[in-house]
Amino acid sequence: DCVLVVVSNPLDAMVQHGHGVSGFPKNRVVGMAGVLDSTRFRSFVAWELGVSVRDVTALVLGGHGDTMVPLVDYCTVAGIPVRKLMSEEKIQAIVKRTKGAGGEVVGLLKTGSAFVSPAMSALEMAESILKDQKRVLACACKLDGEYGVDGLYVGVPCVLGAGGIERVIELELEGDDKKAFDESVVHVKALVDQLDV
């Protein structure tokens, strides 16, 4: 009855591989990417506005890398849409920084990569599973038709509880968000195909 939480990079391919080699049902294999990326997005918004990160909600979908999709329309501060609180220019700078945050950490550390924030993200997921909290978290989930994707692990919001991925929450993506998500899916598929997992 265990749940496999994959945190190793390249995340998108490793979670697909983990599912294949484990033999576990798809709901019991989940990737961490979106939890970490969403936390970084939330942190950057909080720092820019000088507010507690606890009051910021945000989602980052898609692959774990340069093609991730921070959803600005779903970002709020105490329920207030972020676009009401800062300029589009600042928002786009935060989106760009979110996409490059992993590289930023590597550059600052000089050796190795991030370890504290991924550990905290994995802990957040494990706690939701072990305590059956049913948290809504952005995780790499195997999609079977949701978001128009079949048979591929991609970062999307899900309910995470004792059963692992208890359900995928399907958002209606439009315009640039839909286009960016579809491009991210293409990138994830290419990575999975390249690594032959």
Regions found by a protein language model. Give the residues of each.
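C-terminal substrate-binding/catalytic lobe of Rossmann-fold NAD(P)-dependent dehydrogenases
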Residues: S22-R28, L36-V197
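Rossmann-like NAD(P)(H) cofactor-binding subdomain of soluble oxidoreductases
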Residues: D1-R42
